[in-house]
Amino acid sequence: MALSVMCLGLALLGVLQSQAQDSTQNLIPAPSLLTVPLQPDFRSDQFRGRWYVVGLAGNAVQKKTEGSFTMYSTIYELQENNSYNVTSILVRDQDQGCRYWIRTFVPSSRAGQFTLGNMHRYPQVQSYNVQVATTDYNQFAMVFFRKTSENKQYFKITLYGRTKELSPELKERFTRFAKSLGLKDDNIIFSVPTDQCIDN
């Protein structure tokens, strides 16, 4: 049980590691936060609520081995101190019910940038940053995640939707954004929608 929770945590932190040999030896370098767009005038109250994970791109993602993934949802609950309690809801493998993963995103000095709260709970994580790159708040968001774990830098971009389906144009925009950060087609995957768990 503890092992499966740890594996889930690593996946959601951007370490979607494949079973392929040498999957992390040649990671695409993570970009500096300064080179990643930041949503102007970020409005934390409008960003809160449920988002569906429509797409993922990252330097530990491999389409040729993962293909696609089952959609999950993430709920951002705004707190009085402008941090978010963030809950991701996933479908467990083999009809084992729903899985919930809760963490805290603490605002940094720039609106739309966050760090992981309670870092002591994640001893393998040396740093963890979240940056809202772009959003219209009511349809889509693209969020950049970067972490250092065991002296390796991982990054991912998540394409969120307020609904389970997004237009081909938004998916193409997401793909272009991921490639602008050095990722390739093989590092970009899209989810398969589900009605299990993620609307809870």
From Swiss-Prot:
Alphabetical keyword list: Apoptosis, Cytoplasmic vesicle, Disulfide bond, Glycoprotein, Immunity, Innate immunity, Ion transport, Iron, Iron transport, Pyrrolidone carboxylic acid, Secreted, Signal, Transport
Name this polypeptide is given: Neutrophil gelatinase-associated lipocalin
Disruption phenotype: Mice are normal with no visible phenotype. They however show an increased susceptibility to bacterial infections. Neutrophils show significantly less bacteriostatic activity.
Assembly notes: Monomer. Homodimer; disulfide-linked. Heterodimer; disulfide-linked with MMP9.
Gene3D superfamilies xrefs: 2.40.128.20
Tissues where this protein is expressed: Expressed in the cortical tubules of the kidney (at protein level). Also expressed in the medullary tubules of the kidney. Detected in lung, spleen, uterus, vagina and epididymis.
GO cellular component terms given for this protein: cytoplasmic vesicle lumen; cytosol; extracellular region; extracellular space
Organism: Mus musculus (Mouse)
Gene name in the database record: Lcn2
